[in-house]
Amino acid sequence: MMRDDRAVNEVVGFILVFSLVLTTVSLVYAAGFTGLDNTRDVERVNNAERAFDVLANNFQQMGRGEAPNRATEIKLADAQLTTTAERNVTVNASGTNATGADSTAIRYDTTGDTNIVYEHGAVIRNDSDSAIMRREPDFIFEDGNVVVRFIESRGSGQGIGGSASTVLVRAERDTSKVLVNNGSSPSNISIRMQTHEDRAQVWEDYYEEQIAAANSSWSGDCDDRNSSVGGSDTTRIKCDPFGADKLAVSRVKIQVTLT
């Protein structure tokens, strides 16, 4: 009888130990794969961000006349790449005609809350409600000089995702034009820019910092927003006027095709 009880106890003990081991292995397995998935997703976004930096550099080379065309490969996995509707940006000054560009943004959207955008020469990453400018546009604001090189990317309404693993962003330089070249201390320089509401604060911060670097006596801001201009999800920011010793504005049109 004692042997039977001992045998039963051993079986029960084995079952309990086996169940504990199985539960532990299952938890470690699930946690491990969740961690691997998170690591994979983070690395995918980081790779996309690096690809956008390459794209911005390629566009900058075309903007400076260093290349007639460029192609940039971006890996998608479960993400989607689109070109947005065109949004307007202008630079005005006393005694000059209004100058600007109507440019489409290139946007990478993950399955989560992160997106990366190339817009007017800048690369902006947005995580949920937090946006940061990873790469600044090819503008110069310093020591009284303001040089704005508009990269006017064209080709709105395109989108690739789903089963596509990679996208090739083909860009070809179209036309270039010097819009303003004023070295006679232009005054009342004003910047107006349409952007997605999620990126408005980033652009406000950028322009405020840059204008202050060009004109140390400027005490204005760029927080004058108008959400009734430019359509859905678009807001227009406006900077208070400022002066400079020199203002130069150019525009290069670049045709964008996603394949």
Task: Locate the predicted segments by residue.
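Hydrophobic alpha-helical segments
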Residues: M1-A71
